[in-house]
Amino acid sequence: EPGMQIAQEEIFGPVLTVLPFSDREEAIAIANDVEYGLTGGVFSRDIKQALNLAQEIEAGGVYVNEWFGGSVETPFGGMKKSGIGREKGFEALDSYLQTKNISINLDEGDY
């Protein structure tokens, strides 16, 4: 059942949860009806359909026909209660920066 604890929480271990679904819309609803969103996976022979599903899954990363295909250049991070921000890639560098705008009037005058 989609409401089971094992299907609702992130379990950092070798666990696979398999839930039946009737159609595409139900599969997306089950995938997104959780408080977490670190990663997800889609396995399909139809790459176009898999890409469409991956775009609708609310997760920081979605793997298609593989598991953890990332590299040091690939941003990694979650959505929802899985956290915000990204590790690795240019997105990670942004988390170390504080952007500041300084505007200076260079006209000489009495101030």
Regions found by a protein language model. Give the residues of each.
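Conserved C-terminal structural/oligomerization subdomain of aldehyde/semialdehyde dehydrogenase
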Residues: 1-111
